[in-house]
């Protein structure tokens, strides 16, 4: 059973997140392992597996990137996050300058104005990628979606690196 069916959602990329949450909690109430504590071991095992499936499905559909990769998989495209970045060299070369800006920030002790500027640039790129992914899914251009996901992964990664480096800097000055 696919996760869209499990949560009684239409099989499309853009989902009603409120409905997803409502259906998740309904399923949790119905299949929570604690409710079956007095049942047979085989029944408890089945319920536990169902509960794990419900939790995994919820986490997959709730997260934009995971939902995109799952939806691609449902449509016959096997996508692995680990290899996506390596396949988009032109993009990586084009945006390597963001890492240079990060290095400059570190050298300048994370100047607030420069930090805010870089954070805004990255966040705008993330939002743009997400909108492009939604649009390409609507047009069923799955190969384009895969390419944009690799770009989104890059921006998410540099956002995480920036946050990590800034936190290291803050610990050093305190």
Curated annotation (Swiss-Prot):
GO MF assignments: ATPase activator activity; protein-folding chaperone binding
NCBIfam families with a match to the protein in the record: hscB (TIGR00714)
Family indicated by similarity: Belongs to the HscB family.
Keywords: Chaperone
Protein name as catalogued: Co-chaperone protein HscB
A biological process from GO: [2Fe-2S] cluster assembly
This protein's record includes keyword Chaperone: yes
UniProt organism field: Buchnera aphidicola subsp. Acyrthosiphon pisum (strain Tuc7)
Residue stretches making up the J domain: 2-74
């Amino acid at each position: 059973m696919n996760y869209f069916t499990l949560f009684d959602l239409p099989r499309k990329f853009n989902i009603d997140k409120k409905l997803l949450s409502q259906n998740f909690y309904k399923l949790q109430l119905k299949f929570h392992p604690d409710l079956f504590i007095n049942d047979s071991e085989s029944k408890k095992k089945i319920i536990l597996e169902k509960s794990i499936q419900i939790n995994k499905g919820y986490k997959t559909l709730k997260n934009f990137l995971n939902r995109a990769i799952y939806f691609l998989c449902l449509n016959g495209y096997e996508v692995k996050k680990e290899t996506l970045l390596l396949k988009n060299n032109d993009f990586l070369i084009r945006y390597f300058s963001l890492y240079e800006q990060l290095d400059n920030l570190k050298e300048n002790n994370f100047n607030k104005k420069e930090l805010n500027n870089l954070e805004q640039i990255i966040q705008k790129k993330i939002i743009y990628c997400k909108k492009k992914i939604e649009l390409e899914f609507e047009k069923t251009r799955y190969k384009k979606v895969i390419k944009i996901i690799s770009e989104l992964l890059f921006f998410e990664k540099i956002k995480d690196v920036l946050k990590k480096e800034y936190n290291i800097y803050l610990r050093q000055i305190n």
